[in-house]
Structure formats: C-alpha cells, structure tokens
C-alpha cells in the first residue's frame, strides 16, 4: 500500500480549522452513513463480508436455571490472571467471603512473589506460572509450606487451571488473546465464565458463543458496563429489550477542545477523572475505544442490533449502563465506580451477597450529580470505527481490538502521537478487508490477532500527522 492520508478524519490535519467529520470510508467502499436520532450518530455499514451473528450469551433477558448448583459448601473458583488487577480484586472478594467462595486453582504471569503469597493465603490445588524458569523460584518462595500445589508452566498450565475438575466458575482476568485458549478450555469442560477478558468476545465471539451454547455454559460479564446491562435484564420477558445505552466517562479529554488534541501528551491521556486503572485502559477511555469495543461486546452478549446500542457521556460514572424496554421504560444500574461489585456479581449470581458498608461504601444520591451529554464523533472517531468493524463481523472485530492495542502501546512509548492512534487502527482494518474470515476458526482468530499487531507496528508517524507504511 502506498503512503496514505486519511482525509476523511479532517481534524487530524492540523492545517484545518473546520472540524466537521465527513462519513468515514475505508478504501474499497467500506463506508457507512448516519441516522440523526439517539445519543450517538448510529451507523449503517454496507459490506459484502457480513457474517450472521452467533447466538448471544443472554438474548435480551436473563434467568437462572434451576438445578445448576452442583457443589457443596463455598463455590469453587479458578482464576486466570491472579496477580493482575481483576485477579487481585477477585481474591479480595474471596477472602472477605470464605463461606461463599474458595479458590481451587490460580494462573499468574511472572509475579512469583505475589503468587506465593496468594498460594499461602488460599491454598489452591494447582497453580500456573508464565514459563518453566519460574518454577524453582516459586518453590523456593513456598519452602516449608505444607499445602504445596501442583505447578504447571506456560499456556498448558493456564489451560489446566481453566479446566480444573473442581472449579465451577473460571475468572478470566488475563489481558489479550492469551486468554482465549484457556477460556475455550474452560467452556469445553463445562465451567461458567466470569468474563473480564475482552478479546474472548471481541475477537473470539464467532467461535466462543456457539461453543458456550453447545456446552450450556454461562458467560457472566465482569466489567461494570455489561454487568449493569446484565443486572437490568434479570427477569425481563422475551422480546422486552428495545435499546442498550452504554455510559462513558468521556476520559481525560472530555472537556478539551478538539483542536487541542494534536498537542496532548501521554501523561495527559493517563489522567482519568474517575477511575484508577492501568495505562492501556486509561488511554482507551481517552480515545473512547473502550466504549467502541464495549458496543461489540454488548452485541455479542445480549444480541442487540448495532442500531440499538448507543453511547452517552456520563461524567460521574455512577450510572454504569441502562436498558430501554419496549414500553419506553429505562432501567439503570447505579453504584460507585468500583470494579469489585461487577466481579462479585459474576461469582454470586443469581444471589446477592451482603457487603459491609465499611469496605463497600453505600451510594448517597443526595451527594452526587447525574449529568449526560451526547458524545462528539469528531473528538471520538473510535466510535465510527468500532460500529463499522462490528457490522463487518468475522475477524474484523479482533483486528480492530489488536490494532488499537498496538497503537496504544506505540503511543505510550511515544513512537506515535495521540491522533495517530485512530489512523493506525483504520489503516489496519482497511488492509484486513481483503482477507477477512467471516466464520473464523480459533486458529484464524489467533492468527489475525497477531497479524493486526504486526501490521499496525508498520504504521509510523510522518509529516503533518499523516501515517505512512514502510
């Protein structure tokens, strides 16, 4: 491909003062037009490679099935990514509720010191570390510990943790496509999934969802937005869901004029107004790519059409998302911005567990404001890209996610500018059109995830913030 400038994203050209966004168009006719109603300018895409959507995890409503409780005592749980943010918060919940939950297996990366502390505290039967070289270090850290677990390294170790015979629910807290194979193994073993790994659905939805249906596995969302939707659809009658409304904080630049975006630095993007999160997700909040990816997740989880999934800016992050029913009623889930609540609900569902207000502050609505505004498609072109990729389906959604992950990595490393993130993602998706797999296998999903990262890495900044391929 020759060096390319995306002229349709006009605000990327610093020489222009008019910031109207023309309809985006990928080369070769990958275009969409807008409708004017709703909180976002929803898009209709015309693309020859449009796949039939896989069966949703929760088709617009949620009911517990009688007889699913097959264990005695505390629910047995495996955790993939135990030393990460989701994993440590999960273990905090287990420690606070030993009569409700117990840990049977843990998979971690290379933080052996923390993993050893977790093993001593929760006494799992099986643990996994990133590679074989860490086994001796872990054994040394556990010297003298009586309840020494079995230790299996690498990807196979994660898979064994995921399908441990005693586990009922598997928490998938690992980032990226590395979490896809263990999730598939857990589903094939009949384990319910507490899903905190976005790639499982965004990249793997066309493969994972039919598999979950085949094995009668429940996929329970552990992120705040989809947990909110899941909570709102409890008990809804069939066909009652009309619209999904995803709330977004707006990120670090929600109040910054569009013309100032070309000047922002990495440190600016990492100043989230509400949440304390990792670097990648904080940048995703600034670009609103996190919300675009959540639109795709909502489609796969709940079966809503893309025209019926909307985004609204809610600066306070108190309402985590909403659903509208056919009679125009709007149901919302509210709470402090605290990831522990959605994680807890994936473990306790369909039950509600009492939480002490000492460690779980209660919401006082008299002390908070609730405001909303329409998101700006010029400031956040990620929304258009996500809707287009979602409608294309197949491997395009995984390519979008992987390209964004690589672009954010390059931005954090100061190899590209903030506005180049959007260009890198669009160029990568455009290149993928010619070889997109409509109904991909697991191997194709993993292959194109890596392809997208490699291709995105070839897009470099050149004069005038216009990317060029090398």
Swiss-Prot record:
GO terms for cellular component: chloroplast. It catalyses: 2-C-methyl-D-erythritol 4-phosphate + NADP(+) = 1-deoxy-D-xylulose 5-phosphate + NADPH + H(+). The keyword Translocase does not apply. GO terms for molecular function: 1-deoxy-D-xylulose-5-phosphate reductoisomerase activity; manganese ion binding; NADPH binding. Its main location: plastid. Its cofactor is Mn(2+); Mg(2+). 1-deoxy-D-xylulose 5-phosphate binds at residues 198, 224-225, 249, 272, 285, 290-291, 294. InterPro entries: DXP_reductoisomerase, DXP_reductoisomerase_C, DXP_reductoisomerase_N, DXPR_C, DXPR_C_sf, NAD(P)-bd_dom_sf. GO terms for biological process: isopentenyl diphosphate biosynthetic process, methylerythritol 4-phosphate pathway involved in terpenoid biosynthetic process. It is found in: Plastid, Chloroplast. Keywords: Chloroplast, Isoprene biosynthesis, Manganese, Metal-binding, NADP, Oxidoreductase, Plastid, Transit peptide. Mn(2+) binds at residues 223, 225, 294. NADPH binds at residues 83-86, 109, 111, 197, 199, 278. It holds the Pfam family DXP_reductoisom. Pathway: Isoprenoid biosynthesis; isopentenyl diphosphate biosynthesis via DXP pathway; isopentenyl diphosphate from 1-deoxy-D-xylulose 5-phosphate: step 1/6. Its EC number is 1.1.1.267. The keyword Chloroplast applies. NCBIfam families: Dxr (TIGR00243), PRK12464.1 (NF009114). Belongs to the DXR family. Catalyzes the NADPH-dependent rearrangement and reduction of 1-deoxy-D-xylulose-5-phosphate (DXP) to 2-C-methyl-D-erythritol 4-phosphate (MEP). This is 1-deoxy-D-xylulose 5-phosphate reductoisomerase, chloroplastic. It comes from Mentha piperita (Peppermint).
């Amino acid at each position: 491909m020759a060096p390319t400038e995306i002229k349709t994203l006009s605000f990327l050209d610093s020489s222009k003062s008019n910031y109207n966004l023309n309809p985006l168009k990928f080369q070769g006719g990958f275009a969409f037009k807008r409708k004017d109603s709703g909180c976002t300018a929803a898009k209709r895409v015309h693309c020859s490679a449009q796949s039939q959507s896989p069966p949703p995890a929760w088709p617009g409503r949620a009911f517990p099935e009688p007889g699913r409780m097959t264990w005695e005592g505390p629910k047995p749980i495996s955790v993939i990514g135990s030393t990460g943010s989701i994993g440590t918060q999960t273990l905090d919940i287990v420690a606070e509720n030993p009569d409700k939950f117990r840990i049977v297996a843990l998979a971690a990366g290379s933080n052996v010191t923390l993993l050893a502390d977790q093993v001593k505290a929760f006494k799992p039967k099986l643990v996994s570390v990133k590679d074989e070289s860490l086994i001796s270090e872990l054994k040394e850290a556990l010297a003298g510990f009586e309840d020494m677990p079995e230790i299996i390294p690498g990807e196979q170790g994660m898979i064994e943790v995921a399908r441990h015979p005693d586990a009922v629910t598997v928490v998938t807290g690992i980032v990226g496509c590395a979490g896809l194979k263990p999730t598939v193994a857990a589903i094939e073993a009949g384990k319910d999934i507490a899903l905190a790994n976005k790639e499982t659905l965004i990249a793997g939805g066309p493969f994972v969802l039919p598999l979950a249906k085949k094995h009668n596995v429940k996929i329970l969302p552990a992120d705040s937005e989809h947990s909110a939707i899941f909570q709102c659809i409890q008990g809804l009658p069939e066909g009652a869901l009309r619209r999904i409304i995803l709330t977004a904080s707006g990120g670090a630049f929600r109040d910054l004029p569009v013309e100032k975006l070309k000047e922002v630095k990495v440190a600016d993007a990492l100043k989230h107004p509400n949440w304390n999160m990792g670097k990648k997700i904080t940048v995703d909040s600034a670009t609103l790519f996190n919300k675009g990816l959540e639109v795709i997740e909502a489609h796969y989880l709940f079966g809503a059409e893309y025209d019926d999934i909307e985004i609204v800016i809610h600066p306070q992050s108190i309402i985590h998302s909403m659903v509208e029913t056919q009679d125009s009623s709007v149901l919302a889930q509210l709470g402090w911005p605290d990831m522990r609540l959605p994680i807890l609900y994936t473990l306790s569902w369909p039950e509600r567990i009492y939480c002490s207000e000492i460690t779980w502050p209660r919401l006082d609505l008299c002390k908070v404001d609730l405001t909303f505004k329409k998101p700006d498609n010029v400031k956040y072109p990620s929304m258009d890209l996500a809707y287009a990729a979602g409608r294309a389906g197949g491997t395009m959604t995984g390519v979008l996610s992987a390209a964004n992950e690589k672009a954010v990595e390059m931005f954090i490393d100061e190899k590209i500018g903030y506005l180049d993130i959007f260009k890198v993602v669009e160029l990568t998706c455009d290149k993928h059109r010619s070889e997109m797999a409509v109904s991909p296998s697991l191997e194709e999903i993993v292959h194109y995830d890596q392809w997208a990262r490699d291709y995105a890495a070839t897009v470099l900044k050149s004069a005038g913030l216009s990317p060029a391929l090398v």
